[in-house]
Amino acid sequence: MADTLESSLEDPLRSFVRVLEKRDGTVLRLQQYSSGGVGCVVWDAAIVLSKYLETPEFSGDGAHALSRRSVLELGSGTGAVGLMAATLGADVVVTDLEELQDLLKMNINMNKHLVTGSVQAKVLKWGEEIEGFPSPPDFILMADCIYYEESLEPLLKTLKDISGFETCIICCYEQRTMGKNPEIEKKYFELLQLDFDFEKIPLEKHDEEYRSEDIHIIYIRKKKSKFPS
């Protein structure tokens, strides 16, 4: 994948800026740290999903599909996906834990000149009561959130609580084969199907350059309740 890294040898925090070129020639600059946990780096799934949002298959004709739509990103980390959506005209809330808010706000500030919608950062801890999010968003975006087994049920609770029946949830994840990863992925989909319908987006509909056979994009939508017959 043809994005680039910038770093400083004099930086004690070992920070790196990942540069992601958009289709219009502008670039997103994403600050990340080599230490500090999984949320401090830009994962490949975030790049794949960000570039998918730019594809003609997703964007549609005329105004972009995200223009003036409300978007919530879960597990934002560096905010890559949410920032891409904001540059495409969406009104975005990027969310993660308290300890990642400074990094999110730094990346928002670094890219604010590219934003054509709006973007703000908020704290959201999966599994806890939803506060400060008054209505279901049009879209929920999530990249590489299927990672820790202990976070699956809290994540799905938050998805169920914060989404509406018309919310389009787009989940991008890397399929990992080491250790317990296959079991974690299997459990995620077993739990997901209890309350949600989902479908996989074919690889040929991903960005032609930023794609990989082991990185998947799925559309998810909350199941509508059925009345007893």
Curated annotation (Swiss-Prot):
Catalytic activity from the UniProt record: L-lysyl-[protein] + 3 S-adenosyl-L-methionine = N(6),N(6),N(6)-trimethyl-L-lysyl-[protein] + 3 S-adenosyl-L-homocysteine + 3 H(+)
GO CC annotations on file: cytoplasm; cytosol; protein-containing complex
UniProt entry tagged with the keyword Cytoplasm: yes
InterPro entries tied to this protein: Methyltransf_16, SAM-dependent_MTases_sf
Enzyme Commission number(s) of this protein: 2.1.1.-
Modification Phosphoserine, positions: 8
Transferase is among the record's keywords: yes
Subcellular localization, as worded in the UniProt entry: Cytoplasm
GO molecular function terms listed in the Swiss-Prot or TrEMBL record: ATPase binding; protein-lysine N-methyltransferase activity
Function of the protein: Protein N-lysine methyltransferase that specifically trimethylates 'Lys-315' of VCP/p97; this modification may decrease VCP ATPase activity.
Assembly description: Interacts with ALKBH6. Interacts with ASPSCR1 and UBXN6; interaction with ASPSCR1, but not with UBXN6, enhances VCP methylation.
Recorded family membership: Belongs to the methyltransferase superfamily. METTL21 family.
Protein name in UniProt: Protein N-lysine methyltransferase METTL21D
Gene from which this protein is expressed: VCPKMT
